[in-house]
Amino acid sequence: MDVEKIMHSLEQKHPGEAEYLQAVREVLISVKDVYNQHPEFERAKLIERMVEPERILTFRVPWTDDKGEVHVNLGYRVQFNSAIGPYKGGLRFHPSVNLSILKFLGFEQTFKNALTTLPMGGGKGGSDFSIRGRSDAEVMRFCQAFMTELVKVIGPDMDVPAGDIGVGGREIGYLFGMYKKLTHEWNGVLTGKGLEWGGSRIRPEATGFGALYFVNQMLQTRDIDIKGKTVAISGFGNVAWGAATKATELGAKVVTISGPDGYIYDPDGICGEKIDYMLELRASGNDICEPYADEFPGAKFIPNKKPWEVKVDIALPCATQNELNGDDADMLLANKPLCVAEVSNMGCTAEAAEKFVAAKMLFAPGKAVNAGGVATSGLEMTQNSMRLSWSEKEVDEKLHYIMHSIHEACVKYVKQPDGYIDYVKGANIAGFMKVANAMMAQGIV
């Protein structure tokens, strides 16, 4: 495989799509050696097919605000790969949404879903609409307008979206209600639903829970106990909340959360009512974390900075893509943490990830670490198909097993003679091989 030749071709076809190109390059570098062991992959032009989405839907979303003014946003659904199951991936409502970000997320989702052991392909979608500052009625009208187009390309056996940034339980409810009205059908076409109407237990916290199960497995490879370890978390939404909850349950101490305005350092630990307050912060819609320091006087707010300057044992970026850069990596490495794990999708820049791997630090990519969220979505799909509802204990046990299986799959390909595990390479190879074998079995389609 000539990585540079493939990347040059993609850069010509998709200029300016930095996030997408970064994600593709990382995977190609990781899988190059194993790809070259399979000449049949080259004959079938497997990589050239795998890096391009099967289908992209772009549409306008006209809606009316409370004052009667008409707005027009862009909507997208990237159906990236269906080799191992129906397209599966979230919907993101945020002003930053564009095709590059959605293609990167859909590409990553393909391999992440493959790692879960569940039959799910990869997809992603969303809009440049922002829920911030919008009334409940405005959000409802937007979701209904969005679904009038999305309904044409989704279905329980075709494409099953879920939530993501800006799309929580409320938005999923409005989307599902409109889908039901348009199709006259009740089925598992969306995940992240409420428990009363087809949702799965522990879904909101599943990404964070799964991440800590994975991190615990990583630490155990070096005979390290997570109990008593300090943890830096970025963000303060559902993912950060789930991670903080499970970290505390496992005996670790979470000392930071962050927002666009800066970060909170709480040396006493973010636990109990403090974790619950994170949800109040998110529900306020203000997207700032400073009020935490007013609510809990022992905490300190540090404006316009990131939490990676704090000396901790475990660092967990939980906010958004590329939030931890090369300079942040240098700060972390200087403080000699035990582990860094991407809980957000591609939470580290390529430079930061390379520095962690070069330092032989325990470092794992988002496609493995945060797969618990989509795994639990897959479990919701299963429950919908079977017309039943599992208990919290049953779902959590299945999630724990899936994260253990993902860890084993990552280790399988890349454990080095000195014992170091390159989780980035391992996750990419494990996901790639599953998708590649499925694509080869199904012919040139």
Model feature map: region roles:
Residues 21, 37-44, 117, 154-163, ...:
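Flexible, glycine/charged-enriched surface loops at secondary-structure junctions
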Residues 94, 113-227:
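Glycine/serine-rich phosphate-binding loop and adjoining beta1-alpha1 elements at the start
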Residues 262-363, 368:
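Rossmann-like adenosine-cofactor binding region
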Residues 1, 15, 19-22, 26, ...:
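Conserved active-site and cofactor/substrate-binding residues in soluble primary-metabolism enzymes
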Residues 191-194, 199-309:
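Glycine-rich phosphate/diphosphate-binding loop of Rossmann-like nucleotide-binding domains
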Residues 2-23, 218, 333-445:
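Adenosine-phosphate binding glycine-rich loop
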Residues 40-71:
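Structured beta-strand/loop patches that form or line metal/cofactor-binding pockets in enzymes
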